[in-house]
């Protein structure tokens, strides 16, 4: 069993940070026990008939046999592929460690309760959060420039965060058996709206079906968002199907987490996505969403009619 390092992987600086984390984990655990996406799937050089789907399959197959997942998560728009992987691991009962150097807290109201991440469901699913939000202490000037000195402080902060994350990983308890998936409630659909669209968006209207019991998220309006997030998670995993609104610059964190959960426990899931911007990478088919999202769902619904049909089937 291996330790899976989940990270945003489109830019060199993100890959470099994840590689440093994987390197320091491997020094303690052995290289064969650490898996780093992009690196260990040889993503840049991989050749396949449908490359994006093949990359999804390689990552999903590794997620099925991991000891723990360590995810780098930061900023107001967490990577949707990383969130999918977190949801997958959490639904199987695999420990999840979240590493962040973000200096911001988040809330749904100016004076509301604060969380470490923009979606309280991330806080709720973390076995442990390793957070180092401040720059390292000022050191002696390098004598080169203030920019070089600032870079050194940021690099030291990242190193300290990695060291703390490795320590947290080594302190995890012995692995337990996989968490069995709850028995689904027949004719129940859990719906996850997008926080990036108005409340009157079609998803909330179209899910009203007299023959189907629909349940939706409660955490963004709750006085105790963490407790509500845990209830949302339990309700989603106990539903017969999961429908998410994937609208936004990326798939919203909650939607991505639930797609991962559905994929892990074999629950049918669909994503409503009325508009797409496509990504293109060498040797890869055009993708309407992150690979872990596009191939992690059973259906992508493009119209209100398709949503209505999927809900009522």
For the regions a protein language model found, what residue spans apply to each?
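Conserved catalytic or regulatory cores that recognize and/or transform ribose-phosphate-containing ligands
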Residues: 1-313
């Amino acid at each position: 069993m291996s330790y899976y390092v989940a990270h945003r992987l489109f830019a060199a600086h993100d890959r470099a940070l994840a590689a440093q984390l994987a390197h320091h984990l491997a020094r303690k655990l052995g290289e064969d026990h650490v898996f780093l996406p992009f690196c260990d799937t040889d993503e840049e050089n991989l050749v396949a008939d449908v490359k994006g789907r093949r990359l999804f399959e390689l990552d999903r197959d590794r997620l099925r046999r991991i000891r723990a997942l360590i995810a780098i998560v930061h900023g107001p728009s967490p990577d949707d592929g990383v969130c999918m992987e977190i949801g997958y691991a959490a639904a199987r009962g695999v420990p999840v460690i979240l590493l962040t150097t973000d200096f911001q807290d988040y809330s749904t109201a100016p004076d509301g309760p604060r969380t470490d991440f923009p979606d309280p469901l991330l806080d709720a699913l973390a076995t442990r959060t390793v957070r180092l939000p401040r720059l390292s202490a000022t050191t002696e000037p390098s004598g080169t420039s203030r920019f070089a000195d600032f870079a050194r402080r940021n690099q030291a902060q990242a190193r300290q965060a990695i060291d703390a994350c490795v320590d947290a990983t080594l302190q995890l308890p012995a692995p337990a058996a996989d968490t069995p998936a709850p028995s689904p409630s027949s004719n129940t659909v859990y719906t996850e709206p997008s926080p990036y669209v108005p409340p009157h968006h079609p998803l909330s209207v179209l899910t009203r079906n007299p023959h189907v019991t629909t349940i939706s998220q409660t955490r963004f309006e709750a006085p105790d968002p963490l407790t509500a997030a845990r209830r949302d998670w339990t309700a989603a995993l106990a539903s017969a199907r999961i429908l998410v609104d994937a609208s936004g610059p990326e798939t919203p964190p909650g939607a991505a987490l639930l797609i991962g959960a559905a994929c892990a426990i074999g629950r049918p899931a669909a994503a409503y996505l009325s508009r797409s911007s496509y990504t293109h990478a060498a040797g890869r088919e055009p993708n309407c969403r992150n690979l872990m999202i596009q191939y992690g769902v059973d259906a992508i619904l493009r119209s209100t009619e398709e949503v209505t049909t999927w809900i009522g089937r």
